[in-house]
Amino acid sequence: MAVKTVVLGLDGADHDFIGAMIAEGELPNFRRLRSAGAAHEIENDPGQGNVQFWTGAAIGAGPGWHGHYFYLQFDPKTYDIVMDYDIGLPEVTPFWETLDKEGYRAAVVDWYEMPVKPLKNGVVIHRWFAHEPLTHTEFHPPEMAEVAARYAASDPIAEGFASQPREGAEALTEFFDRLLSRIDIKASFYADQIRETDWDLYVACFSEAHNAGHYYIQLEDETHALHDPQLADELRHPLRRCYRELDKGIGKVLDAAGPDANIFMVGGPSMGKFISANSALGEIARRVDLGWNAPRSGAETAKETYHSLIPQGLRRRLAPLARLVRRKVASSDYKHRRFFAVPHNDNAGAIRINMKGREKYGVVSRGAEYDAVVKEIAEGVSSFKNPETGRSIVGRVVDVAREFDGPHRDLLPDVFIEWDRTGTHGDFTHLASEKFGEVSLPRQTRTGDHGPTGYFWAPHSNLASPERPACVTDHILRAVRSAGPTSQQRL
């Protein structure tokens, strides 16, 4: 059997970290791929995280063309915060569905957070060994579940890192070893599938760099405020071990694909220190909207009490209660507000404006009033400073109406606020504004978070540099179509 094109997807992989290990003589398979063609860095869309990075790379479009920005989305009809799969997002067509309609045989395993549709000629597996176990695995066709079970009866980290406190070498090592075991399981599955079936396209994704970056980066980054050199030695530098295992897994896939296959790699978004004001943005937005001394509502007081009483490690188990609190705040309070914070990736905060004609109880008109509110938000949030640096916590304010186009732009928050992470060694703990007072932030479970860049490696040295994730799609489509007749035509 033969495969014409392979796309390796490395969720959360950091291009600079890979490059540094290659320069030290490690990661031979990464080096082999990078030197075989073109290697480009990709800048993510402004204020965006994993969802847009991977969705954009799959469908060839920016966030305004699909409206999907986070796994939790705001519903303007109810003011509720709901799971992305419950809100009825617009249908999108990733590159593998386009190829499937043209008669190509494709397999796609664990592409990050894409709506799942069965393929006529191929295989789709969604959330088999994903970054976080938010939903059950979907297998199309269903019999692929039995095939996958031969390699692992269940996800070795199915409960997720944050399901319980994990401190000390023993607890961190136990979870990390299970995380690494997933790489070999998936690599073996991919290699066997590639050898056993005639594929036009095989998309093989790994998410382990994502998990390792969120929870173990402080053991690799000596400038991190939480760096513990003794613990790093006890765990034998886990990030390096993760990338070495990924390199071995990639080697298995490359050997199975053979020398004639086109090999692409998409990775990112990058990883760095966790530095975010998202946990305080709800309170910051309230003060900017209503004033420093405005009394909290009963719903907001309940939310604050929940966060003060429930330890971070228990919140995943109590997620239904958290959603109830969130709904109470949204339905009771947000309809009376001009703007409010909504959940988003930690690299940037997100604020929704209560717009007339869009939100059920909208109060802000489009045009001059909207522009004035955006300016007020930008100035208000920017007035909060990080005491460690003396600078504003805001690196960039993204006005969605001006930055993004597309028919589904109204599904997005109206303002994204990228946090200024320069010169800071650890997460924000205390913020201060001369106008709006002081805000304290709780300690987060994660120690690492995503940066603004990813990368795209292609087997063609004359490849034009892709500027955004959306530019990846055309290159892959062109490679598959130019590789010859479809598997169906060859039959």
List the model feature ranges, each with a label.
Residues 95, 182, 186-193, 235, ...:
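Alpha-helical packing segments of well-folded alpha/beta enzyme cores
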Residues 180-192, 392-402:
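A Trp-anchored, charged/polar loop motif used as the substrate-binding/catalytic surface
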Residues 196-241, 245, 277, 347-348, ...:
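Active-site His/acidic residue clusters
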Residues 418-466, 472-473:
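Low-complexity, glycine/alanine/valine/leucine- and proline-rich hydrophobic stretches
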Residues 10, 19, 24-25, 32-43, ...:
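Secreted, luminal/periplasmic, and some membrane-associated catalytic domains
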Residues 3-5, 105-107, 182-218, 417:
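Active-site regions of oxyanion-processing enzymes, predominantly non-cytosolic
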Residues 22, 52-62, 279:
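Glycine-rich loop at the start of a catalytic domain that most often binds anionic cofactors/ligands
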Residues 15, 171-176, 228-239, 361-364, ...:
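Glycine- and acidic
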